[in-house]
């Protein structure tokens, strides 16, 4: 009965991959195509009713390069509508800043808990850059995109969980993605292990579609991180 209760608790929280309260997070990533690494530092707070906020800071590096600042970001979400104990509709948004300029995104999540051990979130998101880039026609425009994401959350045991996360991106204006087309996929497999009430380490195996310029190879990325809950 203790394990069943723990699984039910995890199921109610895995849709946002969070536990109530404040936390800090550290994550390191490595892209096998670009040979680029990334270090992420994050602080956040999750409220009991499901709302949350987090602040993120990243740095990138190559093997022989110095650490360079990536971006700063603040993100928040709120469970606006919950018609049943299984269905939740949750809007969210974020703003970010990096050396080339600022941007942001708004999204709407729809989560449904099918069983105590499986729930699915479908996300519709619009990504916007406040700065202009040169498009395929040589004109300056905003490289904005529309994104559809799915989060297939599985509770394997009271400590171990897995998320399958495919995302589809479509460039709204005349820009191509790294694969040479107006659209691309990013697929993430996340494995988490809950050590205790404080520590939650995880590993992510990601495929970021094929890059045709300048790497001419599949973009595979490995992320290793941990969260500490207070």
UniProtKB/Swiss-Prot annotation:
Its main location: membrane. Pfam families: KdgM. GO terms for biological process: monoatomic ion transport; oligosaccharide transport. It is a multi-pass membrane protein. Residues 1-20 form the signal peptide. Keywords: Cell outer membrane, Ion transport, Membrane, Porin, Signal, Sugar transport, Transmembrane, Transmembrane beta strand, Transport. It is found in: Cell outer membrane. Outer membrane channel protein that allows an efficient diffusion of low-molecular-weight solutes such as small sugars and tetraglycine. However, the specific substrate recognized by the OmpL channel is unknown. This is Porin OmpL. The gene is ompL.
